[in-house]
């Protein structure tokens, strides 16, 4: 068997997430169906580096899968790209070592989160940016977001009921830009890993701080007390994008 690594992008609106699940349309299953056709009907399992939720998008999701024999990677990419549904794009395919695992190989991830703060909102972007209808002081967000950078226990920003034992992660980039033309906020987070719904919970908290309903020092308190109840609401998934995954050599 030969192992292949692929970078894919997808519009998450019509998917129930990346991971295969009963009676639901998922990115994993769509790609597996195409690979089965390309593999003479033999089953193929696709592994993903990140398990995006329903409605979450990706520019740079990484997957891997095994096929019998060696194939021309550009022909394989083209076949996957043209035979998989139109809301999935196969950006690249390469052959990798048999022990490469896209999820467990050491890597960093970058997420973006788009927030529409326009008045009126942009209805064409309703599936691709989260609308926030309340007033914001962007200087408060810019001040608070810096407290997320560094190595912390992010228990206070993860969803309840998760089975992960170690909630310590390192965030290397946490920033916000204002796109004045589109009236969008663009949040960017890079790090060595993120907990379940961590990015959406961080954004929800930052928006509440910007609206003045939480103090600017709230993030420090959440990190110190590890209490999800101190954080803001979970921002909707439609504004979240898995932008890039970079593997260490």
Curated annotation (Swiss-Prot):
Substrate binds at residue 111. GO terms for molecular function: RNA binding; tRNA pseudouridine(38-40) synthase activity. GO terms for biological process: tRNA pseudouridine synthesis. It is an enzyme of class 5 (isomerase). It comes from Streptococcus suis (strain 05ZYH33). The active site is at residue 53. Pfam families: PseudoU_synth_1. InterPro entries: PsdUridine_synth_cat_dom_sf, PsdUridine_synth_TruA, PsdUridine_synth_TruA_a/b_dom, PsdUridine_synth_TruA_C, TruA/RsuA/RluB/E/F_N. This is tRNA pseudouridine synthase A. Its EC number is 5.4.99.12. Formation of pseudouridine at positions 38, 39 and 40 in the anticodon stem and loop of transfer RNAs. HAMAP family: TruA. Belongs to the tRNA pseudouridine synthase TruA family. Homodimer. The lineage of its organism: Bacteria, Bacillati, Bacillota, Bacilli, Lactobacillales. Keywords: Isomerase, tRNA processing. It catalyses: uridine(38/39/40) in tRNA = pseudouridine(38/39/40) in tRNA.
């Amino acid at each position: 068997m030969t192992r292949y690594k692929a970078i894919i992008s997808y519009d998450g609106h019509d998917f129930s997430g990346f991971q295969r699940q009963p009676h639901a349309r998922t990115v994993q299953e769509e790609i597996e169906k195409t690979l089965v056709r390309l593999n003479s009907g033999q089953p193929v399992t696709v592994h993903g580096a990140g398990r995006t939720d329903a409605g979450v998008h990706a520019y740079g999701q990484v997957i891997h899968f095994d096929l019998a024999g060696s194939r021309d990677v550009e022909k394989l990419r083209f076949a996957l790209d043209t035979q998989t549904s139109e809301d999935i794009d196969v950006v690249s395919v390469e052959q990798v070592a048999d022990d490469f695992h896209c999820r467990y190989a050491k890597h960093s991830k970058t997420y973006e989160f788009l927030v529409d703060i326009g008045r009126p909102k942009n209805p064409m972007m309703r599936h691709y940016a989260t609308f926030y209808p309340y007033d914001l002081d962007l200087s408060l967000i810019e001040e608070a977001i810096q407290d997320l950078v560094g190595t912390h226990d992010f228990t206070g920003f993860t969803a309840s009921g998760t089975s992960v034992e170690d909630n310590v992660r390192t965030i290397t980039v946490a920033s916000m830009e204002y796109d004045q033309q589109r009236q969008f906020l663009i949040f960017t987070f890079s790090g060595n890993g993120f907990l379940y719904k961590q990015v959406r919970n961080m954004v929800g908290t930052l928006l509440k701080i910007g609206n003045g309903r939480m103090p600017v020092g709230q993030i420090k308190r959440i990190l110190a007390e590890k209490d999800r109840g101190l954080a803001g609401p979970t921002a909707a998934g439609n504004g979240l994008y898995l932008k890039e995954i970079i593997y260490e050599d």
